[in-house]
């Protein structure tokens, strides 16, 4: 694959995850919506990483802030803090008690606020690709 094809792959899968995020939110699966929102940002940052780095294989990390730094994402004022908060939505690495606490915290209003932030960040990252 060429560099451009790798970038397009990550963009496509990221956009697919945005749709899944919305569908999970509509279905009331707020925790999963945010988990998938995290994945969407991770993938779009990997597309940016490929654009701004010599290699075609982005780092194997789920840490959005680290990916953003290595992808040379031009952060706006509160982006770093928001990325660190969204890192917490990567539930696959969490213990069951943490998942349960997150599930309780994950109301419609809580999820809706972060979904707006995820979509804004996504758009900002796409604009830098």
What are these regions (language model features)?
Residues 1-129:
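Terminal alpha-helical segments
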């Amino acid at each position: 694959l060429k560099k451009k094809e790798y970038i397009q792959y990550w963009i496509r899968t990221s956009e697919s995850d945005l749709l899944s995020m919305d569908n999970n939110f509509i279905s009331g699966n707020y925790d999963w919506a945010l988990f998938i929102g995290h994945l969407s940002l991770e993938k779009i940052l990997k597309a940016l990483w490929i654009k701004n780095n010599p290699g075609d294989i982005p780092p194997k990390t789920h840490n959005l802030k680290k990916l953003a730094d290595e992808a040379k994402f031009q952060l706006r004022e509160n982006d770093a803090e928001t990325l660190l908060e969204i890192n917490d939505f990567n539930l696959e690495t969490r213990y069951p008690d943490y998942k349960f606490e997150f599930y309780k915290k994950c109301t419609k209003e809580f999820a809706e606020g972060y979904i707006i932030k995820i979509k804004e960040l996504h758009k900002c990252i796409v604009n830098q690709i």
